[in-house]
UniProtKB/Swiss-Prot annotation:
Region described as Disordered: 22-41
Species name: Drosophila pseudoobscura pseudoobscura (Fruit fly)
GO biological process, one term: mRNA splicing, via spliceosome
Gene Ontology terms: cellular component: nucleus; Prp19 complex; U2-type catalytic step 1 spliceosome; U2-type catalytic step 2 spliceosome; U2-type post-mRNA release spliceosomal complex; U2-type prespliceosome
Coiled coil: 9-29
Protein name from the UniProt record: Pre-mRNA-splicing factor Syf2
Length: 226
């Protein structure tokens, strides 16, 4: 009797363990399916989604802090500065200047043209509708132009516009001088090249093989080479 009871207990225990394993397998299958669905959803999002999400959360928190400061009658910008150290404030200011004026020198002609266009657009004077209507009335049909329109004798540049153009050209010349990468030639250096391209090639050879060819070069210069 005790032996049969022990056998039934073992069977019940095995069934309970089997049921527990079955539940765990179902839970693992459900978790895996949910993870696959979530991963597929993440793949369908834009590449910069996480960065945009963090930025949106920061903007919401910043707007809320600004509203709380205004409700308390405090200057929010001053409160932000109090939380920033002098070193961090200087770093932020430098980063802001680089962002406002990201001129790191010449890169490509397309980038240079686009930058010059943006700079000229920003430097345009404010819209003057009175001047616009006056010029429109003076020029008549020639105001909108056409295939045979000539404005040479109809318009005249103001001294202020001419001075502005001259100043702009002077600034362009100064910037080009600043970012010029042309090396100044040293008159005391040995002449072992025929042009600038050959000079660069010789310097590259000397950088890689100079220590191995120094003795051969000296013998050639002395005329004692075999």
């Amino acid at each position: 009797m005790e032996q049969s009871k022990s056998a039934s207990d073992k069977l019940a225990e095995r069934k309970a363990r089997l049921l527990d394993l079955h539940k765990k397998r179902q839970e693992a299958r459900t978790d895996n399916h949910q993870e696959v669905v979530a991963e597929d959803a993440r793949k369908k999002l834009p590449k910069n989604w996480e960065a945009r999400k963090r930025q949106a959360e920061w903007l919401l928190a910043d707007d809320k802090a600004r509203e709380d400061a205004q409700a308390a009658g405090k200057d929010y910008e001053r409160l932000k500065l109090l939380e920033v150290s002098a070193i961090d404030a200087e770093r932020i200011e430098k980063k802001k200047k680089r962002k406002d004026n990201p001129d790191l020198g010449f890169s490509t002609y397309e980038a240079q043209t686009a930058r010059q266009y943006s700079r000229l657009v920003k430097g345009m004077p404010a819209r003057d509708m009175e001047k616009y209507e006056k010029q429109k009335a003076e020029l008549g049909e020639a105001f909108y132009g056409g295939p045979h329109t000539t404005l040479h004798a109809l318009t005249k540049d103001t001294p202020a516009a001419i001075n502005k153009m001259v100043n702009d050209l002077d600034q362009q010349i100064e910037r080009r001088k600043k970012y010029s990468r042309r090396r100044i030639y040293n008159d005391d250096a040995d002449v072992d090249f025929i042009n600038e391209r050959n000079s660069k090639f010789n310097k590259k050879l000397d950088r890689f093989y100079g220590e191995h060819t120094a003795e051969i070069k000296q013998n050639l210069e002395r005329g004692t080479a075999i």
